[in-house]
């Protein structure tokens, strides 16, 4: 990991601790996902709230969910040229996701 003097040291150390703390099974899974790519069957369009960890809310592991975070979990009408439509198209056409969840909540932000 590249070190930047302005970047909070606790996050650099936290990442190092996370990598060192991976079990053999977890490490093998991440290596597999890195080599073979992801194959999520579910896409979630959620808000950008940093308090919400979408895969954790469903007890899902790495590579299981394709997550798009967007302000207010909005999905614009068809025909608008935007990154959200591109992400949905990618999820459906490239990953063949079978389900799309649009998830919002009160008191966001």
Outline where the language-model segments fall:
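Short glycine-/polar-rich loops that comprise or flank the Walker A/P-loop
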Residues: 65, 97-98
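Thiamine diphosphate
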Residues: 79-95
